């Protein structure tokens, strides 16, 4: 059954998992949420530059007068949002994904419900990396540079905030220098 906003696919199939290639319109998002409300696992894609951008797109797909209910429905059904950017590897012609993972924990759910700023969700995502396996693009980009897999300038350009990325990388490099370790970004940071 092709799920193109079709309620029939949800009702007529006893599927545990529904895969939606891409949620391009409100009708498809509405159907996906309804399926999740019925207990089915729904996996889909959405074109967005970040996990928070995808979350925002889902909420703003609801008309203004339904947005509060939309927030509740999204917060109640969403379990995680994963975003990726493909970056060129330093050591080959291949690409490597920089991945952002936002799990919908109780605290993140509250942020969605109450329309709190995305900065709070980013902070919760950073703090939850050990407990929930979450990470921001910033954390992933730092890690890729530290592991010498991606060029510093490429990571900086891919960062949500290049100036913040540069400041954090400089701070990490300074801390390592004080400890007698190799700077985070090697020779590139001095450039």
Residue ranges and their predicted role:
Residues 10-12, 35, 118-121:
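A short alpha-helix capping/helix-coil boundary motif
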Residues 77-191:
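Conserved P-loop NTPase
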Residues 1-5, 9-10:
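Single conserved hydrophobic/aromatic residue that forms the stacking wall/gate
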Residues 14-86:
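Conserved P-loop NTPase nucleotide-binding/switch module
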Residues 7, 30-34, 142:
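Alpha-helical segments flanking ligand/cofactor-binding loops in enzyme cores
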């Amino acid at each position: 059954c092709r799920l193109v906003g079709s309620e029939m696919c949800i009702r007529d199939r006893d599927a545990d998992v529904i895969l939606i290639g891409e949620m391009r319109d409100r009708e498809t998002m509405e159907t996906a949420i309804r399926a999740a409300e019925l207990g089915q696992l729904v996996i889909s894609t959405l074109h967005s530059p970040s996990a928070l951008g995808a979350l925002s797109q889902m909420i703003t797909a609801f008309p203004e007068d339904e947005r509060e209910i939309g927030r509740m429905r999204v917060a109640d059904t969403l379990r995680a949002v994963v975003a990726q950017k493909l970056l060129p590897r330093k050591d080959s012609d291949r690409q490597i994904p920089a991945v952002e993972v936002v799990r919908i924990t109780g605290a993140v759910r509250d942020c969605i419900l109450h329309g709190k700023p995305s900065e709070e969700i980013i902070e919760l995502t950073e703090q939850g990396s050990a407990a929930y396996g979450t990470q921001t693009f910033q954390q992933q980009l730092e890690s890729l540079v530290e592991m010498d897999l991606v060029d510093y300038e490429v990571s900086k350009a891919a960062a949500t905030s290049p100036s913040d990325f540069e400041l954090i990388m400089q701070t990490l490099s300074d801390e390592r220098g004080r400890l007698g370790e190799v700077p985070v970004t090697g020779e590139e940071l001095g450039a």
